[in-house]
Amino acid sequence: MFPDDSLTLHTDLYQINMMQVYFNEGIHNKRAVFEVYFRKNPFNNGYAVFAGLERIVAYLNDLTFSQTDLDYLASLGYNGSFLEYLRDFKMQLTVRSAKEGDLVFANEPIVQVEGPLAQCQLVETAILNIVNFQTLIATKAARIRSVIEDEPLMEFGTRRAQEMDAAIWGTRAAVIGGANGTSNVRAGKLFDIPVLGTHAHALVQVYGNDYEAFKAYASTHRDCVFLVDTYDTLRIGVPTAIRVAREFGDKINFLGVRIDSGDLAYISKKVRQQLDEAGFPNAKIYASNDLDENTILNLKMQKAKIDVWGVGTKLITAYDQPALGAVYKIVAIEDENGHLRNTIKLSNNAEKVSTPGKKQVWRITSREKGKSEGDYITYDGVDVNHQEELEMFHPTYTYINKTVKNFDAVPLLVDIYKEGQLVYDLPSLSEIQDYARQEFDKLWDEYKRVLNPQDYPVDLARDIWQDKMDLIDQMRKKAYQTGAEK
């Protein structure tokens, strides 16, 4: 449909505008450092689950301007020498990132991009687009997983997703967050995700009754989960499922029944009773119907007899918070001597003031307890493991502090690209999910609560904090002086 298309123009127009400014001013190759972070954990949660790195890599690997890209930019009025620069464009970025499945927190760098200024500027939109969506879905799935514990969680949201790409990559993100499988066949194929499908109400309506529909399904498929709420769950649907299961006997594997409507707590208890009394104690009860972590928590409080959870709309759309709000800010720029100079963005809102400098985030873990004590942000090049103790204090409320001893410090940001060359081996999706579970187990329970979690410590090294305060003072004075001169 769109020949010679590429994702390189998957960006905002002002990025191209700024690139041309940098090019015309001769500063497009100046070294710069940008960092991605979000200001508030999503869903009022205690953490987020990082996802999207694999798609960032796919995007950066193909970052070139096609002829149709250049023709289109020419039609917008960009000049010849700038277009020639774009024609010869070769990605030279150095990228560090959290690993997919890492638990990440507000106000810490989760992706860091370094390289020629114009190139850093170009990739902002796509990176934020990817991280904002996939991290949100992975976090939502993790919240649901924390409520259902070890029970199966299936992603059922494709038809409600915001178009096809969102369905595919959202499914993958949901698996990172803890989903066991999906109804999306293409996602199963692309990412080797287990797929599960039962049947819709349409099958029953086509045959006119549950009995004929269930028989037809059982004649075709050995593994059977019957949808029992088309007409009357307790008086027709479940008794008919039991009847067909008995008639077919060993010819089918009667896995259970699915409920998609009604009072799931009450109905599931009655269904469980019917299945048990009929001699099918191993048949599972599958539930769907606009579920999320809050609904499931409520159902569990009512002791609902549900074995498998199918979560669709409210997972794939991150229904209660459809945006993460991650931002991409410049933190350092090359000066006239070839050294990186720290930069800062000021704001009337304290939470929107950026933290200057190229940084590393260290996950501080107690050797004694094996639990994460907090994240400690230092300038790049500092090795926290050489320190016997750490002074950690809140960057806003500095009187809140603690000293940590006998710890291990692991860097959060790992090398993905070095000067345009991919140096990171992408793990499989199952490896990412296992890693995410391991990291989740290291978090104290008070940070994992679905409701009113405790704030996880994300602290600045004292020199960064002091430099930030000094830069705020310097930039305000400079801004006032410039304004006064006018």
Which residues are covered by each model-predicted region?
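Buried, small/hydrophobic-residue-enriched core segments of structured protein domains
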Residues: M1-K30, K40-P42, G77, L83-Q92, ...
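Hydrophobic residues within beta-strands of alpha/beta enzymes
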Residues: L196, V257, I285, D307-W309
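Gly/Ser/Thr/Ala-enriched C-terminal appendages of enzymes
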Residues: M1-K30, F34, N44-N45, A283, ...
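Short amphipathic alpha-helical segments
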Residues: G52-R55, L136, S428-I432
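Short coil/turn segments at secondary-structure boundaries
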Residues: D71-Y72, T139-R143, G157, K448-D455
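N-terminal, Lys/Arg-enriched amphipathic/low-complexity engagement segments
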Residues: K30-R87
